[in-house]
């Protein structure tokens, strides 16, 4: 209150003249390095703030206020300000009125949930359903040992929440009481919603769905968490294919806010409406997509990761490719992302997208070799990334046709613009806003860039790709 009222406040640890003279600059430099490490060089506002702090070391209060006014004026006129408003409206408004959503009244009541699988992903689902839907949840797997391990994981996670004060002991006990596991599919007979999280192989998913359909009611909705397989192909094993819908979470399940709800060719309005209602009750943002390879997020990330590996295979180093793509402003570079999702998973995604279209999507044999090696990054004792693994660099060495950073970056930008345009033409989603929402909520596309389509317009990639733009007028700041 005193600061707002204009009074000078005595600070206990206010730096003196000596400290200001000797430590101010280094402190700002450390802060700048930290911001660059965490956010990259693309965001405008944190660096302007640091410039103001650096300049505040000396001079009058009036001069400092003028600098602040100039900085605010620069920010308000910037592309990033307009893009941030667009992104904010996407998340706050567009997300609440999803394109193509059926009437909410068609959604069926979910009073019991079944989870097919008890691995890490499946256990995360079960935990989320227990806490958000507050209904009984039953899990199954191929062995009692795996079921027990899944239940142990869920229980331990609940215990951690109690220890942190985020969950009462009574609620913890209630959730544990609602959790069960069984090898017998008969335990799923009274489920209203069953979701699978089994091995990412079509035949296996078809088999478990065919078995579960024998015991559940005709009203029960079936959902698949597949990230790359055809929901239509899975539905072929069902007597009632209309009950199946895609329900693609992102990892970690509790943190990532997006769910891609996949409407297959025969998915009923009731199934889609129920999926949308379940997503809402889970406090997730749901976007409806068609049954197309990779849906939205994995299709675009699959393209990006493929192009990154293509550049490495051609002869560029990991560092050179990461640096070339850094202006996209993504929270992590392609190789950090590959290690995060798992090298085997990454190779599988690239293979799946390559099978979808061999001309547009690149599959890397070197990525399979890296997956066999099992390591891409070198970390220190605290887990912080230090460099790239020496053996990994040896595995990918040998390319003789390395492109420049500018060539790599332009190729990625234009390729992404072409892919987004195709997705809209194929009706994977209905609007560019749907794609932007998916990338912001599912791939952590930076808010200050406003989503992928405004960025591609501003960068000129849309014009190069198809001679136009995704938005008219473009989402840009004030121009002189």
PLM-predicted stretches and their roles:
Residues 1-480:
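N-terminal glycine-rich phosphate-binding loop for ADP-containing cofactors
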């Amino acid at each position: 209150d005193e600061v707002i009222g204009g009074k000078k406040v005595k600070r206990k640890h206010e730096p003196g003249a000596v400290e200001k003279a000797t430590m101010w600059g280094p402190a700002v430099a450390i802060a700048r390095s930290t911001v660059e490490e965490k956010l990259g060089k693309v965001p405008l506002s944190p660096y302007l703030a640091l410039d103001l702090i650096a300049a505040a070391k000396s001079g009058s209060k009036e001069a400092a206020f003028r600098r602040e006014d100039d900085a605010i004026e620069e920010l308000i006129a910037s592309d990033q300000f307009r893009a941030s408003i667009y992104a904010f409206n996407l998340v706050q408004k567009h997300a609440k009125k999803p394109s193509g959503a059926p009437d909410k009244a068609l959604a069926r009541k979910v009073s019991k949930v079944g989870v097919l699988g008890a691995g890490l992903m499946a256990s995360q689902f079960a935990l989320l359903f227990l806490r958000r839907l507050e209904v009984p949840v039953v899990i199954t797997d191929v062995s009692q040992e795996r079921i027990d391990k899944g239940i142990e994981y869920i229980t331990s996670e609940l215990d951690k929440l109690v220890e942190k004060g985020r969950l009462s002991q009574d609620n913890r006990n209630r959730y544990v009481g609602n959790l069960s596991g069984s090898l017998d599919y008969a335990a799923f007979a009274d489920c209203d919603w069953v979701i699978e999280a089994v091995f990412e192989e079509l035949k296996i998913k078809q088999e478990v769905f065919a078995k579960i359909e024998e015991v559940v009611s005709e009203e029960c909705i079936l959902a698949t968490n597949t990230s790359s397989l055809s929901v239509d192909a899975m539905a072929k094993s069902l007597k009632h294919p209309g009950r199946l819908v895609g329900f693609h979470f992102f990892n970690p399940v509790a943190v990532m806010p997006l769910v891609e709800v996949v409407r297959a060719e025969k998915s009923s309005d009731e199934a889609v409406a129920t999926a949308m209602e379940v997503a809402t009750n889970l406090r997730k943002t749901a976007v409806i997509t068609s049954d197309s390879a990779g849906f939205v997020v994995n299709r675009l990330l699959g393209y990006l990761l493929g192009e990154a590996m293509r550049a490495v295979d051609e002869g560029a180093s990991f560092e050179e490719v990461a640096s070339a793509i850094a202006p996209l402003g993504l929270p992590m570079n392609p190789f950090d992302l590959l290690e995060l999702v798992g090298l085997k998973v990454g190779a599988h995604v690239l293979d799946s997208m390559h099978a979808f279209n061999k001309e547009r999507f690149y599959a890397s044999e070197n990525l399979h070799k890296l997956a066999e090696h099992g390591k891409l990054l070198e970390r220190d004792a605290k887990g912080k990334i230090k460099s790239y693994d020496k053996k990994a660099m040896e595995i990918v060495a040998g390319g003789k046709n390395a492109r420049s950073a500018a060539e790599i970056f332009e190729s990625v930008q234009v390729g992404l613009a072409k892919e987004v345009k195709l997705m809209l033409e194929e009706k994977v989603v209905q609007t560019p806003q749907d794609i932007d929402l998916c990338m912001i909520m599912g791939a952590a596309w930076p808010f200050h860039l406003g989503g992928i389509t405004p960025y591609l317009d501003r960068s000129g990639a849309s014009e190069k790709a198809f001679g136009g733009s995704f938005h008219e007028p473009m989402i840009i700041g004030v121009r002189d």
